[in-house]
């Protein structure tokens, strides 16, 4: 036997060195998977011719032996050869071990891709070598398969399971009711005037310190900084405000006319003032004002000299706290209403 070849073959330009032992040995198959039955290597042509001649001689000998043995032995031999030929057809790859039995039919190949519609079937086609290849799709409609898959291949909404309550009269009544509502309420599809939302036309609430102020409760409500609507007023709003101001001025002028003193009151007031100047002494308020005026004039004309430190004058210490100051201002505001004459007739 020849030496087993392991590894890649030599290029065609290089010739393998043959030894005497290799020439004496019989050629053996190359290590690796066997070739398909329809393919043969070129190196084995000579050996195949020798094998063919030897096989022919062996077949002749076998036929002669079978003739001697009888017809039964010849029939068994033919059946065995036919089984061997069937086993070799369509085989690729290495042979199975002797303990395993070859399957009669190869398993179906898995389908890759979308499935065919239920009415189409692939027609198998035979190849040149006798093998079946999947052919073109034929639009052959199988009625039995279609009937079995009717329930599974439903596309669209399912039909109603119960009786359908549909009445032509009820549909007409609904349409008439809709038309009646549309006529009574007006056309809802009419274009509405486009108005901006409030956040587009109004200023946001005024924020002080942006959350950085003291975390205490408010003692009193914040005073309004003023009318901030000037920034968002439209021409219509400005015209409306101007009319309101004019009406307010007219009402004030009417009140002033009502409060105007009559000629009789003016005449009596002049007589009373002249009588008081001639007959009565000065009031305490007038005396106090005169003293303050004279003192201020004297201090202005007096020569200024260095005086010792006086805490009240130099530091101007406030003798009233905030609460006393507010109470004094509030009481002084009421003096005019307490000691003034009425708004009507001054004299009876």
Swiss-Prot record:
A motif (GPALPP motif 1) lies at residues 7-12. InterPro entries: DUF3752 (IPR022226), GPAM1-like (IPR046331). Pfam families: DUF3752 (PF12572). There is a cross-link at residues 279, 316 (Glycyl lysine isopeptide (Lys-Gly) (interchain with G-Cter in SUMO2)). Residues 60-69, 144-154 have a biased composition (Acidic residues). The modification N-acetylalanine is found at residue 2. A motif (GPALPP motif 3) lies at residues 93-98. Residues 41-59 have a biased composition (Low complexity). A motif (GPALPP motif 2) lies at residues 32-37. Residues 14-27, 177-195, 235-269, 277-287, 295-317 have a biased composition (Basic and acidic residues). Residues 108-117 have a biased composition (Pro residues). Keywords: Acetylation, Isopeptide bond, Phosphoprotein, Ubl conjugation. A motif (GPALPP motif 4) lies at residues 113-118. The modification Phosphoserine is found at residues 28, 106, 138, 143, 148. Residues 1-163, 177-317 are annotated as: Disordered. This is GPALPP motifs-containing protein 1. It comes from Rattus norvegicus. The gene is Gpalpp1.
């Amino acid at each position: 036997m020849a030496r087993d070849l392991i590894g890649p073959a030599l290029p065609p330009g290089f010739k393998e060195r043959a030894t005497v032992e290799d020439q004496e040995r019989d050629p053996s198959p190359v290590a690796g998977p066997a070739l398909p039955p329809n393919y043969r290597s070129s190196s084995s042509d000579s050996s195949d011719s020798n094998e063919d001649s030897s096989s022919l001689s062996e077949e002749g000998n076998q036929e002669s032996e079978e003739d001697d043995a009888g017809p039964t032995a010849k029939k068994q031999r033919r059946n065995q050869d036919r089984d061997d030929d069937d086993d070799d057809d369509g085989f690729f790859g290495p042979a199975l071990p002797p303990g395993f039995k070859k399957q009669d039919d190869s398993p179906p190949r898995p389908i890759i891709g979308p499935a065919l519609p239920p009415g189409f079937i692939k027609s198998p086609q035979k190849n040149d070598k006798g093998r079946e290849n999947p052919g073109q799709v034929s639009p052959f409609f199988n009625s039995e398969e279609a009937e079995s898959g009717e329930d599974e291949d439903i596309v669209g909404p399912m039909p109603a399971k119960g009786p359908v309550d549909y009445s032509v009269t009820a549909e007409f009544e609904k349409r008439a009711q809709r038309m009646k509502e549309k006529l009574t309420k007006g056309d809802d599809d009419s274009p509405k005037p486009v108005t901006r939302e409030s956040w587009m036309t109004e200023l946001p609430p005024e924020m002080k310190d942006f959350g950085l102020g003291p975390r205490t409760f408010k003692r009193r409500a914040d005073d309004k900084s003023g009318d901030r609507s000037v920034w968002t007023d439209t021409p219509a709003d400005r015209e409306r405000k101007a009319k309101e101001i004019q009406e307010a001025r007219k009402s004030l002028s009417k009140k002033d006319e009502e409060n105007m003193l009559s000629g009789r009151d003016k005449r009596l007031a002049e007589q009373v003032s002249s009588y008081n100047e001639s007959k009565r002494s000065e009031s305490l308020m007038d005396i106090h004002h005169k003293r303050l005026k004279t003192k201020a004039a004297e201090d202005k004309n007096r020569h200024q000299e260095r005086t010792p430190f006086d805490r009240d004058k130099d530091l101007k210490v406030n003798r009233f706290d905030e609460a006393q100051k507010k109470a004094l201002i509030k009481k002084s505001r009421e003096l005019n209403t307490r000691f003034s004459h009425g708004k009507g007739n001054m004299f009876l």
